[in-house]
């Protein structure tokens, strides 16, 4: 929750700055990514969404982009009623009405677009559809939060093009630090234009690499 609060604060600052600039229109898009599983990525994404909607009274949608094994719907206690799979045939004709019809409302005020219920259904979701969803959602909400899978898919690359704010999650172990370093290099190679917040989850544990050492190794400040 502490990590989500920090990212929420950053997102709010981005929103305030965007409101002052004529060049930016629509929602602030925040993508949460971890280069390996088990980093608490989905917990941070769901907490961030509920903080922004419940405490900060923002209009928020949460997109579960972990198409093969996403758990956002389950973690938030929502019924498996609808998902992104219901939009697979609406790529070019997708509009706000169609998108709203498949979103699941949470008690915090967040609207969730769930991942498919079965892994094999992920193949039906094209990257262009995800880009279209983010584009439409950006006109409906103040914040679009995207819970990315722990690997760089074409869908992830598609949303990076429209991401304002990337929460990059690392845990205090050598494997995670190595993979995070690679992720930072890839972002540079892709000329990623958004801001990158490095989040060390479980940084308060007595075992593992310290936050200071991680920041120095990655040459990047920790949020």
List the predicted regions and their residue ranges.
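Acidic-aromatic/histidine active-site loop/patch
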Residues: 1-29, 189, 195-196, 200
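Short, hinge-like loop/turn segments at secondary-structure boundaries
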Residues: 5-9, 77-82, 186-187, 214-217
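Walker A (P-loop) phosphate-binding motif
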Residues: 19-61
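Soluble periplasmic/extracytoplasmic beta-strand elements of cell-envelope proteins
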Residues: 31, 112-114, 197
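A short, flexible beta-alpha/helix-coil linker loop
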Residues: 35, 69, 117-120
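Phosphate-binding loop that captures ATP/GTP phosphates
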Residues: 55-112
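Flexible beta-alpha connector loops of hexameric P-loop NTPases
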Residues: 84-92, 119-125, 173-175
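Conserved catalytic-core segment of NTP-binding enzymes
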Residues: 124, 128-222
